[in-house]
């Protein structure tokens, strides 16, 4: 399998791109779960804060020096929840990380990776690790979750479509605040409740500004 992949390249035209943007606690993980495994959809099992990761000085050093083996191992270490166990989402995963690394390196070793190619290759490697097919038409779905991550992804992939999850504001507010209270007792304050409410407003305002060019109604 790996020998055949060494000289294999994917036509850029067969890929489209989409982001999942949440507006609070609105079911973005559920949406991604529904898309996971759909033929032609290439995605991870959860949120991927890629652009926060890529800004780290150590990551930039690995990219510059083409230390791709160290780079992908660090990615796995920093995104443990995507490969092994996601405690927050209560998910048990059993991804063959050795296979993932081999496939990623086969896709990357002959290239000078920038952040855009790196991001694309980790998605392809994950998809192929799960023994899923690359079809004639594919959509890479990035669970960006937050506005900053979404903006960064759109800058790299210009024709990205946004998949935006929304919910009744009252249920959204109650669920979000209660979830944070259960997760971190320090968040039990009016200040955090206000910040959460403001985040819902800001995320949805951003989504509305993008609706003409990027917005996809579900």
For each of these PLM feature ranges, what is it?
Residues 1-17:
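Extreme N-terminal, non-catalytic leader segments
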Residues 21-22:
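The Walker A (P-loop) glycine that initiates the GxxxxGKT/S ATP-binding motif of P-loop NTPases
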Residues 25:
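Walker A (P-loop) phosphate-binding loop of P-loop NTPases
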Residues 28-40:
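A conserved segment at the C-terminal end of the G1
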Residues 40, 50, 59, 181-182:
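Residue-level marker of structural boundaries
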Residues 42-45:
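Conserved catalytic segments around the Walker B and adjacent sensor/switch elements
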Residues 47-141:
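PAPS-dependent sulfation machinery
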Residues 115, 129-218:
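PAPS-dependent sulfotransferase catalytic domain
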